[in-house]
Amino acid sequence: MKLVVGLGNPGPRYAGNRHNVGFMAVAALARRHGIGPFRRKFQAQVADGQIAGARLLLLAPETFMNASGQAVGEAARFHKIAPEDIIVLHDELDLAPGKIKVKQGGGAGGHNGIRDIEAHLGPAFWRVRLGIGHPGHKDRVLTYVLGDFAKAEEDWLAPMLDAVADHFALMLEGRPADFMSKVAAQTRPAEKAKPLATAKPKEGEARTSGGSVAEVGAPPPSPTGLAAALAEALDRKSQKGNG
């Protein structure tokens, strides 16, 4: 059994953020392959299913990004899933918009969600890095990742999500190079994302060393909040299945 994780912040407030592209990818996988419904378990929204005969558990943490390892670790221990059988989809500032890269192990690259998973499970899990581009200056990163995708970004975002969902069976078969090749052939990454003006974090959020956010004093998200956000994100971002 594989554990397939999408990273993001829970709730409609963050549903369209660039930082939530991992959630969007999990939603695209669920819809393309008929997996669901999602239910609340392991401090996350989870759904069991199969892709090309391979059993998997889709998981989107209901913790905030910086505590993603709590949910992933809990699910992995319960199902006795080794880190080598865990695939995490997440946003990547250092890749051009629409470009993806896959790697196993390595460092967190400044991504606090990945860092927290490493703290709970070690570094041996797989990462599918979904390029969102860089705003051009480190002072703009927080505003950029917590900003919603612009309409102009739909030109590469929806095709990337579609391609990931179309060819994900290759990842489950242990063929990451073929997966990357197929996604690249199906998409045409944008050359560069435009930087946004620097802004302060939203009220109730704290800046972290890696540019992610933690919500201060916020109530826990409702059990159905993330499922609704996943559905909303997919309806907005996926090209296929809409006639």
Swiss-Prot record:
Biased composition (Basic and acidic residues): 189-206
Reaction equation(s) it catalyzes: an N-acyl-L-alpha-aminoacyl-tRNA + H2O = an N-acyl-L-amino acid + a tRNA + H(+)
Active site residues per record: H19
Entry GO terms, CC: cytoplasm
PROSITE patterns tied to this protein: PEPT_TRNA_HYDROL_2 (PS01196)
Family: Belongs to the PTH family.
UniProt name for this protein: Peptidyl-tRNA hydrolase
Species the sequence originates in: Rhodospirillum rubrum (strain ATCC 11170 / ATH 1.1.1 / DSM 467 / LMG 4362 / NCIMB 8255 / S1)
